[in-house]
Amino acid sequence: MQYTYLIIGGGIAGVTAAETIRAHDSHGSIAIVSDEAHMLYSRVLLPSYIKKRIPREKVFLRSIGDFEAKNIVVMSGERVMKIDSVRKEVFLASGRTIFFEKLCLFLNLLCYGLNLSLLLFIVLL
């Protein structure tokens, strides 16, 4: 698989980046890789859902249809194991390899062993 824009991180920052890129580039291919099983949900609303005060669908901030309508590929439940910024490759725990032209990282604070000096950060917009 190869994408013009590869976004690692499916939280609000990653999703907003994908939507913003799409608004400026209607033809480039965009993919979001997230280790979360479900895309963009509100952690704030989870207690209300658990207490059955709101329906499950209210917890999700975007549907898969929202991404499909914008031609954004979502890879949920996929953990990134390695990034090769020179060859522009990302290796997933599932064994898949993704090639990219531009890479955006939206990582949480639990990135153990990440050597930032080896990464190439690209400002997209």
Which residues make up each language-model segment?
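Beta1-alpha1 glycine-rich phosphate/pyrophosphate-binding loop at the start
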Residues: 1-73
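FAD-binding core/adjacent interface of flavoenzyme oxidoreductases
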Residues: 1-6, 63-125
